[in-house]
């Protein structure tokens, strides 16, 4: 698994634009969103129980991530058509404002394989979060088992702390003081 300090290698995944436009699909690579931080959130599967709670909770903070020059990307190994169908079928997902992705490739350009979060026994991604700086260097990684959801507020808190470039105490709140 890639970890803090590792750089993203070339990859290509299918992005799904927010708001279900006609031209919803596009390619996301390591060069997409130049100059931005990337918060990459993997979840196991579309049409499940825990996953939409995470996606909706992350989306509620989408503007907070954007305010920090970060692009929020949530996705799984389900294909792009599955994502659009899920967004159409699930009332809360119809309103999401962030980019989703389908990581269906295997091999050289597979992001999930590069990051090491494909969980073969389930045929799905682990609940993994990567915060990647504008130079494509991983600054933070968390990985949960399939049954435990994450705290988007904690992800935002860590992003905010990383962006200070300073020492940050435990439980430092977003925008809080750093250690001098």
Please place each PLM-identified region on the residue numbering.
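Chalcogenol-based redox active-site neighborhoods
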Residues: 1-180
């Amino acid at each position: 698994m890639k970890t803090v300090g590792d750089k993203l290698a070339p990859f290509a995944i299918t992005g799904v634009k927010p708001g279900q436009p006609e031209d919803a699909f596009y390619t996301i690579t390591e060069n997409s969103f130049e100059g931005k931080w990337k918060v990459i959130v993997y979840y196991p599967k579309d049409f499940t129980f825990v996953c939409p709670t995470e996606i909706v909770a992350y989306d509620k903070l989408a503007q907070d991530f954007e305010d920090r020059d970060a692009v929020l990307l949530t996705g799984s190994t389900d294909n792009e058509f599955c994502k659009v169908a899920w967004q159409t079928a699930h009332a809360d997902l119809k309103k999401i404002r962030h980019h989703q992705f389908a990581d269906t490739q295997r091999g050289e350009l597979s992001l999930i394989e590069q990051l090491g979060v494909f969980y073969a026994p389930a045929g799905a991604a682990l609940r993994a979060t990567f915060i990647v700086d504008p130079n494509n260097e991983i600054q933070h990684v968390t990985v949960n088992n399939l049954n435990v959801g994450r705290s988007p507020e904690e992800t935002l808190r860590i992003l905010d702390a990383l962006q200070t470039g300073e020492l940050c105490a435990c439980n430092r709140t977003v925008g809080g003081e750093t250690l001098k």
